[in-house]
């Protein structure tokens, strides 16, 4: 079976009737008949009233919700006494709806990966609330509480080389979740591995090979196949294409889009590359110093960002046109051990006012978006 041909990030109108899972303006190619034939059926407290209605007004089922989510890291004793606590995630409220991709962007150290790890139970949260499929997860929930949710929420790591055991054949690695679940015979497990490898565009004969025999893009396909083994409903993709070159990034992004259309998946897509997030997301949340500063539909946020930090992020992206203006965000991200009293972006903001220095801005609903800024 030949390797899946190289794909390009798709632009332009390629079909007249986009699927309900597509981002605004996205026009992807339909799946092949073979891909459609082998598809796996998808598996079927502090918030203001106006914000709650905003989150639910589109009618889609919300399958992930966080309210005022906080994660603190205890760094030990202060020299002057007391505990030294780093707040990596500060009162983050997000939703992910069935069949959509939420892009989570921000600079390094903004808390993106920490949020993703809390949503799959790799890290406990300190305070706030996490609800998955309507079930509340306690801050330090035991493994038994997570067990019925494990197969429904899976994680795709940034470095596929580190995510795979170098001494384990890839077929065995893909089958590992099936072994843990323990509900398939050996023949059924082998058939499922073959199905998963075909699903991500790899020949089934590769199952006997070891990870070092594959390229970075092929290894990431293997990691995705393993994540799909138990028919999850949500994939948390933590910088899933950051370690790949541009051509491989395009292939993996298109693979994730195809899988979403075919299996009805929801994605939390964590990245710092704004171009990739724009290609794959339906909605985008912008994170700064552990706090959400703006969320909204992808098209609206990219065309007219409301928060000064969102604007600065987009303006800092290099453009291919010669002589195109490019602005660089002045200053550095504040230390999470000593954040400003008011708005965390205030020391770097060109539109800062006196109130910004003293009063943290609440997250306000502005049309179909939310923004934390005193300008609104």
Swiss-Prot record:
Span list, region Disordered: 1-25
One GO-annotated biological process of the protein: peptide transport
Membrane topology according to the record: Peripheral membrane protein
Subunit structure: The complex is composed of two ATP-binding proteins (BMEII0205 and BMEII0206), two transmembrane proteins (BMEII0207/BMEII0208 and BMEII0209) and a solute-binding protein (BMEII0210).
SUPFAM superfamilies on file: P-loop containing nucleoside triphosphate hydrolases (SSF52540)
Domain ABC transporter: 64-314
PANTHER family: D,D-DIPEPTIDE TRANSPORT ATP-BINDING PROTEIN DDPF-RELATED (PTHR43776:SF7), TRANSPORT ATP-BINDING PROTEIN (PTHR43776)
Localisation: Cell inner membrane
Residues forming coiled coils: none
Function, as annotated: Probably part of an ABC transporter complex that could be involved in peptide import. Probably responsible for energy coupling to the transport system.
Any one of the GO CC terms: plasma membrane
Binding-site residues for ATP, renumbered to this chain: 106-113
UniProt GO MF annotations: ATP binding; ATP hydrolysis activity
Similarity comment: family membership: Belongs to the ABC transporter superfamily.
Matches recorded under PROSITE patterns: ABC_TRANSPORTER_1 (PS00211), ABC_TRANSPORTER_2 (PS50893)
CDD domains, alphabetized: ABC_NikE_OppD_transporters
Entry EC number(s): 7.4.2.-
Protein's organism: Brucella melitensis biotype 1 (strain ATCC 23456 / CCUG 17765 / NCTC 10094 / 16M)
InterPro entries the record matches: AAA+_ATPase (IPR003593), ABC_transp_ATP-bind (IPR050319), ABC_transporter-like_ATP-bd (IPR003439), ABC_transporter-like_CS (IPR017871), Oligopep_ABC_C (IPR013563), P-loop_NTPase (IPR027417)
Annotated protein name in UniProt: Putative peptide import ATP-binding protein BMEII0205
Alphabetic keyword roster: ATP-binding, Cell inner membrane, Cell membrane, Membrane, Nucleotide-binding, Peptide transport, Protein transport, Translocase, Transport
